[in-house]
Structures are given as structure tokens and as C-alpha cells.
Design a protein with these regions (language model features):
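Nucleotide-activated chemistry modules centered on ATP-dependent adenylation/adenylyltransferase
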Residues: 1-189
Length: 189
């Protein structure tokens, strides 16, 4: 089953994605990509360029050889790690525009600072996530991951009461100077 939106995917599965149920990645990213690449492969050879770095040896990234797709890993071929990739992005004026991660805006992998920036900069998206939690029953955030509330409603209430994540009060301690510099990853796409 392929879906066009996270909300549709969640409603169809009648549950929120979590580290134990990563159906969203498969149904929103992998299956549509496989379908498109299979159609391309039917027309001839397809090279699939994957942005995994040389310092990410254990990650495979998109294995499509069963449908005739050739995976290419240029960063690995060049021996580039995270520093070389960011240096290249800086040389081309792109470093400030690239988010640290490109997951969904209500992904269970988010860190508390990312939740804060979503609430601060994109309240409409926040509320869409909060409503999905209520509709399906459950939370996007993993219980016990940190000392913050788990549900988006309770987390919003904590933010509204003035509680601010340490990463947002002292960004110089938590950002990679070369990354998004504390900018909202949704805004920087």
C-alpha cells in the first residue's frame, strides 16, 4: 500500500509510526521509489545515486538490485566523510540550506529542539500532528526518551508555559556551526 501523505498512511494503519513500527518509511518513501525505479529500469539501465558517506559503512541505503537498479555511492567512492561533504556544501553556498535530517516534521526520531522549532515556526503542522495523536491514540514521541512530556498536546502546553529546550537557549553548545545554525529544518528545505 502506497500513500501520498503521512496522515493518510497513519489513518490507514490505524496507528502512529514509532521506532518499532516504521511503516511510514516503507509506505511513503521506499515503495513509491521502488515502483518508479522499476518503471525506469524497464526502459534501460538505471544508476541510483545514494548519498551515504565513507564514514557510514554499516548503512546500505536503497537496495534495488532485484529490479535491475545499480546503486552508486559517490561519497564512499571518493572517501568522503561528514567533514568533506560539509566543506563541499560550504564551497557551493549550500550548507545553510541543508537540514541535519530530512525526516517528516512529526517524526519520532526528532530531538526536543526540533519539536520546539516545529511548534515555534509551523504551528499549523504542529496542530496537524497533535490532531493525529488524538485521532489515532498514541504519541509520536517515544515515552521515557527524555524528561519532556510525551504527547504533543502536553509538550505544546510546556512550551506555552515558557519551558524552552536547552538546545534553543544555548544553541552554540548543541549546533554544528556548519549545520543549519539552529534554523528550523522545515524552513530550510
Amino acid at each position: 500500500v502506497m500513500h501520498t501523505s503521512l496522515g493518510e498512511c497513519i489513518r490507514n494503519n490505524k496507528m502512529l509510526p514509532s521506532f518499532r513500527a516504521r511503516f511510514c518509511t516503507r509506505q511513503i518513501k521506499i515503495e513509491p521509489a521502488r515502483k518508479r525505479m522499476a518503471a525506469l529500469a524497464a526502459q534501460g539501465e538505471v544508476n541510483h545515486y545514494v548519498g551515504l558517506r565513507a564514514d557510514e559503512e554499516t548503512r546500505l541505503g536503497g537496495i534495488f538490485d532485484d529490479i535491475g537498479i545499480v546503486n552508486r555511492h559517490p561519497f564512499r567512492e571518493w572517501g568522503w566523510g561528514v567533514n568533506e561533504v560539509w566543506q563541499c556544501l560550504q564551497r557551493h553556498g549550500l550548507a545553510e540550506r541543508i537540514p541535519e535530517r530530512t525526516d517528516c516534521d512529526v517524526c519520532y526520531h526528532q530531538q526536543i529542539g526540533e519539536w520546539w522549532r516545529l511548534w515555534t515556526n509551523h504551528l499549523d503542522r504542529w496542530m496537524r500532528g497533535e490532531n493525529l495523536e488524538i485521532e489515532v491514540g498514541g504519541t509520536f514521541r517515544t515515552p521515557g526518551r527524555d524528561t519532556w512530556p510525551t504527547s504533543m498536546r502536553e509538550l505544546r502546553e510546556a512550551f506555552e508555559s515558557g519551558r524552552i529546550p536547552k538546545s534553543e537557549r544555548q544553541p552554540e553548545l548543541f549546533s554544528r556551526g556548519t549545520m543549519t545554525g539552529g534554523a528550523c529544518r522545515v524552513c530550510s528545505l
